[in-house]
């Protein structure tokens, strides 16, 4: 099956099937309500700077799609809304457009619609191992990217019938990429989370930030369950549907090692606020914006505003004048997340 066909299959499955794994760990985080906030809601400053780009509030639309003619309009709507809102976004894996240059416009449309926004390129670690720095450079140049995400999607590859399963010398190759590429490198999981031990390895390799891509949002093991035809592969995919570290577990594990992007089941501005309070620099989500973009750019704008309003409300009700104060907020942690923190010391 061509990479392009696989991409549109993934997109349709995400839109039409139940592909979320549920528990993110953010359910175990409570922001402590301040009955007298002593701040003016209208003066709250949500702006941050990320890799030299100002964002109106700490949100990225996560890597999602591209690489098929049907995805061009989706990326155009996302880019348009991101530019207007003053936030950032990532494109989906650019492998298909590198293999077939006729598909490049499904990605380049993002930069056309968002000339000033923070936009990051995206390519898979299996392809980087196979082809080296050259493929990363091409991904960056294709969209004039401000950064590049190298996605670590080995759970998906293990379930996928045509999966790339060689991870040998991955760290060595990643070190070479970080030395050579002219933009910051983000190491990005795609639904199974990143542990402290791996975060330390990634820092030593020269990675600039981590997108934890934790469990709790879209499960690509689940996505592959809907694609595979043989019963053994389907059964294995079901077994690993809930595999990985929940998003909040990864955030607390990786904080302080590298800047953390919180992705994996964030569905509101409150989720973004909780993520920042426990150690993330900013939040990110894909599925809510994908569903909105299928309808219109206006729906994407509404979803962005929903996240922005929720974040600002959480900041107001906890007495935070800016995002730095949110980072220093004391929170109540319970349940499995508390057990994880105790276990990890």
Swiss-Prot record:
SMART domains listed in its UniProt record: IMPDH
Major localization class: cytoplasm
Task performed by this protein: Involved in the biosynthesis of isoprenoids. Catalyzes the 1,3-allylic rearrangement of the homoallylic substrate isopentenyl (IPP) to its allylic isomer, dimethylallyl diphosphate (DMAPP).
Pfam families registered for this protein in UniProt: FMN_dh
Similarity comment: Belongs to the IPP isomerase type 2 family.
GO molecular function, one term: oxidoreductase activity
InterPro entries per UniProt: Aldolase_TIM, FMN-dep_DH, IPdP_isomerase
Gene Ontology cellular component list: cytoplasm
Catalyses which reaction(s): isopentenyl diphosphate = dimethylallyl diphosphate
Protein's GO biological process: isoprenoid biosynthetic process
Location of this chain's protein in the cell: Cytoplasm
Enzyme class: isomerase
Keywords: Cytoplasm, Flavoprotein, FMN, Isomerase, Isoprene biosynthesis, Magnesium, Metal-binding, NADP
Assembly notes: Homooctamer. Dimer of tetramers.
Binding-site positions, FMN: 63-65, 93, 122, 188, 218, 265-267, 286-287
CDD domains the UniProt entry points to: IDI-2_FMN
Binding site for substrate: 6-7, 93-95, 156
Lineage: superkingdom: Archaea
Gene3D superfamilies documented for this protein: Aldolase class I
Gene: fni
EC assignment: 5.3.3.2
Protein name as catalogued: Isopentenyl-diphosphate delta-isomerase
Transferase listed as a keyword: no
């Amino acid at each position: 099956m061509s990479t392009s066909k696989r991409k549109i299959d993934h997109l349709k499955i995400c839109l039409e099937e139940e592909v979320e794994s549920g528990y993110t760990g953010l359910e175990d985080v409570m922001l402590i309500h301040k009955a007298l906030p002593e701040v003016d809601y209208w003066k709250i400053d949500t702006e941050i700077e990320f890799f030299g780009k100002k964002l109106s509030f700490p949100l990225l639309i996560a890597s999602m799609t591209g690489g098929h003619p049907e995805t061009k309009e989706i990326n155009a709507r996302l880019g348009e809304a991101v530019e207007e809102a003053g936030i950032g976004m990532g494109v989906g894996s650019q492998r298909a457009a590198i293999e077939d240059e006729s598909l490049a416009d499904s990605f380049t449309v993002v930069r056309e619609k968002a000339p000033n926004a923070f936009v990051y390129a995206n390519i898979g670690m299996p392809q980087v191992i196979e082809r080296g720095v050259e493929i990363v450079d091409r991904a960056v140049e294709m969209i004039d990217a401000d950064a590049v995400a190298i996605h670590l999607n080995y759970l998906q590859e293990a379930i996928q019938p045509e999966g790339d399963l060689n991870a040998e010398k991955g760290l060595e190759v990643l070190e070479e990429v970080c030395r050579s590429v002219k933009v910051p490198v983000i190491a990005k999981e795609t639904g199974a989370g990143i542990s402290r031990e791996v975060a330390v390895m990634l820092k030593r390799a020269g990675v600039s930030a981590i997108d934890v891509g934790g469990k709790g949002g879209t499960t690509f093991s689940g996505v592959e369950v809907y694609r595979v035809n043989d019963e053994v592969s389907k059964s294995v995919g079901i077994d690993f549907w809930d595999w990985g570290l929940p998003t909040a577990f990864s955030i607390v594990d990786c904080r302080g090692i590298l800047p953390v992007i919180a992705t994996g089941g964030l569905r509101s501005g409150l989720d973004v606020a909780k993520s920042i309070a426990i150690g993330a620099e900013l939040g990110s989500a894909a599925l809510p914006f994908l569903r909105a973009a299928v309808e219109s750019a206006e729906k994407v704008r509404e979803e962005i505003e929903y996240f922005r309003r929720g974040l600002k409300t959480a900041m107001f009700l906890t007495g935070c004048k800016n995002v730095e104060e949110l980072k220093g907020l004391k929170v109540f942690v319970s349940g499995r997340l508390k057990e994880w923190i105790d276990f990890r010391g």
